[in-house]
Amino acid sequence: MEKEDLGLEITELRLGLPGAGGENNTDKDKNKNKKRVFSDIEGENSSSEEDGKKETKNQVVGWPPVCSYRKKNTVNEPKLYVKVSMDGAPFLRKIDLAMHKGYSDLAFALDKFFGCYGICEALKDAENAEHVPIYEDKDGDWMLVGDVPWEMFRESCKRLRIMKRSDAKGFDLQPKGSLKGFIEGVRK
């Protein structure tokens, strides 16, 4: 008895893809095992447009595909995300400066992020506060938040840091009433 008579060809171990068959495949079987694109299925009978389809298959136009509403939203509004860290807080936050209209909105957002660490009291009483908000500009210099106009701050800010006053002395950054515009926005 031969193997074909017993039906053992299904359980036979081969190198290759399952269902690919042996070496005695015909051209019809080889074409059957290849994957087909939707355009191949749609236009199987029309051979006149075959050359044009082969050229368009090789082109990858918009990959990865992005929804049109997402394209519109990302093009119109640039995002200005900045990392915010606070001394004593075990986590960092990211804040979008483009969403805020001024220092008062930023102060309110920081109060929401770090309210449990007493940032509200620190921002209200800048002269006696335990914490001082500072930022790093494009040049790598640390400056007090509120020293420059809001638009200049938005353009130059790379990251924000709320540090302890004792550490800010090392940077030679001490608030002298310069945070009044920043502090007025903190609401309770």
UniProtKB/Swiss-Prot annotation:
Biological-process GO terms, alphabetical: auxin-activated signaling pathway; regulation of DNA-templated transcription
UniProt main location, coarse: nucleus
Disordered, as annotated region: 16-57
Extent of motif EAR-like (transcriptional repression): 13-17
Keywords for the protein's UniProt record, in alphabetical order: Auxin signaling pathway, Nucleus, Repressor, Transcription, Transcription regulation
Induction context: By auxin.
Entry GO CC: nucleus
Domain PB1: 79-167
SUPFAM superfamilies: CAD & PB1 domains (SSF54277)
Matches recorded under InterPro entries: AUX/IAA_dom, AUX_IAA, PB1-like
Localization per Swiss-Prot or TrEMBL: Nucleus
Primary role: Aux/IAA proteins are short-lived transcriptional factors that function as repressors of early auxin response genes at low auxin concentrations. Repression is thought to result from the interaction with auxin response factors (ARFs), proteins that bind to the auxin-responsive promoter element (AuxRE). Formation of heterodimers with ARF proteins may alter their ability to modulate early auxin response genes expression.
Subunit-level organization: Homodimers and heterodimers.
Domain comment quoted from the record: The N-terminal half of the protein contains two conserved domains I and II. Domain I includes a slightly degenerated ERF-associated amphiphilic repression (EAR) motif which seems to be involved in the activity of transcriptional repression. Domain II is required for the correct degradation of the protein through the SCF-mediated ubiquitin-proteasome pathway. Interactions between Aux/IAA proteins and auxin response factors (ARFs) occur through their C-terminal dimerization domains III and IV.
Family named by the database record: Belongs to the Aux/IAA family.
Name of the protein described by the UniProt record: Auxin-induced protein 22C
Classification of source organism: Eukaryota, Viridiplantae, Streptophyta, Embryophyta, Tracheophyta
